[in-house]
Amino acid sequence: MVSPDMIRNVVGIVGNVISFGLFLSPVPTFWQIIKNKNKNKKKMEVVLAAEALFMVSPDMIRNVVGIVGNVISFGLFLSPVPTFWQIIKNKNKNKKKMEVVLAAEALFMAAVALGVLLGVHTHQRRSLIVGILCVIFDTIMYSSPLTVMSQVVKTKSVEYMPLLLSVVSFLNGLYWTSYTLIRFDIFITIPNGLGVLFAAVQLILYVIYYRTTPKKQNKNLELPTVTPVAKDTSVGPISKDNDLNGSTASHVTIDITIQP
């Protein structure tokens, strides 16, 4: 007979793979930033970094090194990379703003860690405080793509909608919700359940406005070429009645051929 713990481990392993995909989903955007030298600010990486930082705290407090810890450790390593890259390459006013945001996150994280470790003396209360913060930041992470939904509705275009992120967020939230239902954990159930709802809304909007999105024109489309063909036809002397100076003239006939 299959035990609930074995089922939970199997679901957790699959959830690991999907969570890796969630943290890797900004990679195509990051590659475009490097390729096109785009300095536009991206909010998602900062939120992912903060979310990963706070999800490390319950594992440290509970001394748990397992399925969840593997995912969050990977996210903590990967998430800040695009943000730090943009800070290094960004030379406009957004650079200073991003530096302030990251510094504020680091200070807030340090304050929470010191406050919990020094001010709270039981593991149960520490887990409760940090768990609440995890719920808040996980919810922010899942809801962050909703910031472009108003633009999608206004323009009736899904051009700037992060489809890959929405799909992976939906699968990630669905799996981790299933994971916690086998053995209930409210701190994982609430944010991931909301994540399923938020991602479903994003996918529904994508289906609705996909057909109304203007199609991009092919930049490699070849236009018709115009080839002038000149024919020189000499004409004898023109009578003085037609030319007051008595000079000779020539008529040039130009044929234009359009080749598709």
UniProtKB/Swiss-Prot annotation:
Pfam families: MtN3_slv. Residues 1-9, 62-63, 121-127, 183-185 are extracellular. The keyword RNA-binding does not apply. Residues 10-103, 129-212 form the MtN3/slv domain. This is Bidirectional sugar transporter SWEET7a. The gene is SWEET7A. Gene3D superfamilies: 1.20.1280.290. It is found in: Cell membrane. Belongs to the SWEET sugar transporter family. Forms homooligomers and/or heterooligomers. Keywords: Cell membrane, Membrane, Repeat, Sugar transport, Transmembrane, Transmembrane helix, Transport. Its main location: membrane. Mediates both low-affinity uptake and efflux of sugar across the plasma membrane. The chain crosses the membrane at residues 10-30, 41-61, 64-84, 100-120, 128-148, 162-182, 186-206. It comes from Oryza sativa subsp. japonica.
